[in-house]
Amino acid sequence: MVDQLRERTTMADPLRERTELLLADYLGYCAREPGTPEPAPSTPEAAVLRSAAARLRQIHRSFFSAYLGYPGNRFELVALMADSVLSDSPGPTWGRVVTLVTFAGTLLERGPLVTARWKKWGFQPRLKEQEGDVARDCQRLVALLSSRLMGQHRAWLQAQGGWDGFCHFFRTPFPLAFWRKQLVQAFLSCLLTTAFIYLWTRLL
């Protein structure tokens, strides 16, 4: 998927192209088959994102692991999460962006087909997922997240220095407490959103 994006690069919108490439790199990395060698990051920001996402998942291991094998509609869940996490006051932050992309990547990982948690909530087990289904969802999530970041949040992204600013932010040697606070605040927003989504789906 990353190679396909590189092939159609036109330089008409460098920021959008970097955004799509970054998302394709991380989500494709998450969606690969178990046992597949880990591909090298395609860009400097891809390496930074993988590192930041790994730290976030380590801090909140139980939350993210619960979404492995999510049997519902990945696209709809991430769309709801994006609307809440990016638009909720005070708006986007780098921590929120990392949290959202990490969440999307977790949904694409090849975990158990359906965990006990999802069975308890009324989801039915599904048959073994086809490779094409994961690839399709990966492409749809790249398009969705790119659209969100390059739409109403483009001005914010540019004001932060784009993806160069992203790399600078996470490579700056802030105290660990400051760095962790950024991710914890974004995570709490994500957690509240998932609680709302659960209640919403149960009432439908």
From Swiss-Prot:
Superkingdom of the source species: Eukaryota
Expression tissues: Widely expressed in adult tissues. Preferentially expressed in lung, liver and kidney.
Record keywords: Apoptosis, Cytoplasm, Cytoskeleton, Endoplasmic reticulum, Isopeptide bond, Membrane, Mitochondrion, Nucleus, Transmembrane, Transmembrane helix, Ubl conjugation
Cited InterPro entries: Bcl-2-like_sf, Bcl-2_BH1-3, Bcl-2_fam, Bcl2-like, Bcl2_BH1_motif_CS, Bcl2_BH2_motif_CS
Subcellular location(s) per record: Mitochondrion; Nucleus membrane; Endoplasmic reticulum; Cytoplasm, Cytoskeleton, Spindle
Gene3D superfamilies reported in the protein's UniProt record: Blc2-like
GO cellular component terms listed in the entry, alphabetical order: cytosol; endoplasmic reticulum; membrane; mitochondria-associated endoplasmic reticulum membrane contact site; mitochondrial outer membrane; mitochondrion; nuclear membrane; spindle
Annotated TM spans: 183-200
Chain spans, region Required for Ca(2+) binding: 118-133
Known role: Promotes cell survival by suppressing apoptosis induced by BAX but not BAK. Increases binding of AHCYL1/IRBIT to ITPR1. Reduces ITPR1-mediated calcium release from the endoplasmic reticulum cooperatively with AHCYL1/IRBIT under normal cellular conditions. Under apoptotic stress conditions, dissociates from ITPR1 and is displaced from mitochondria-associated endoplasmic reticulum membranes, leading to increased Ca(2+) transfer to mitochondria which promotes apoptosis.
Name this protein carries in UniProt: Bcl-2-like protein 10
